[in-house]
């Protein structure tokens, strides 16, 4: 699978500069919007990508999509938090020979390892394509997480 032809990175956003108010985000530096706090968390992907630790009045959420893993600093940051629910990328499929179809996304096995390390109260696997879901129907999942 080839990545999109986007040499600039988010090039389409630069065409419509008046439609969005841009704010530079820095790793682990929270921003507040009303009663919500968003902390950018660096993720491993084909280009620099952030996940987010989101604090709401009622729960703490880890939102980790478009990732092939977490840098150690990100993992350690999140392990210090009480996470109510973790949404995590599981877009790569692992075939019966153990071959992963994407180097830019986690498999459900890799996502499970991160979930175990973070110990959230709940977890949801996200960023899954219909082809992966079809294949997963025949594979008993070794963990109690929701797809």
Q: Which sequence ranges carry the predicted segments?
A:
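Binuclear metal-dependent hydrolase catalytic cores
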Residues: 1-64, 68-76, 81, 130-147
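Cap/insert and terminal regions of metallo-dependent hydrolase folds
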Residues: 69-147
């Amino acid at each position: 699978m080839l990545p999109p032809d986007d040499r600039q990175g988010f090039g389409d956003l630069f065409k419509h500069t008046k439609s969005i108010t841009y704010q530079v985000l820095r790793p682990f530096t929270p921003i507040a919007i009303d009663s919500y706090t968003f902390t950018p968390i660096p993720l491993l992907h084909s280009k620099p990508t952030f996940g987010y630790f989101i604090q709401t009045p009622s729960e703490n959420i880890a939102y980790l999509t478009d990732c092939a893993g977490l840098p150690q600093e990100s993992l350690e940051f999140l392990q210090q938090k009480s996470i109510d629910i973790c949404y995590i990328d599981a877009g790569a499929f692992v075939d019966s020979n153990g071959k992963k179809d994407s180097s830019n996304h986690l498999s459900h096995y890799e996502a499970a390892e991160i979930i175990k390390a973070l110990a959230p109260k709940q977890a949801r696997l996200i960023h899954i394509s219909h082809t992966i879901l079809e294949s997963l129907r025949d594979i008993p999942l070794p963990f109690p997480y929701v797809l």
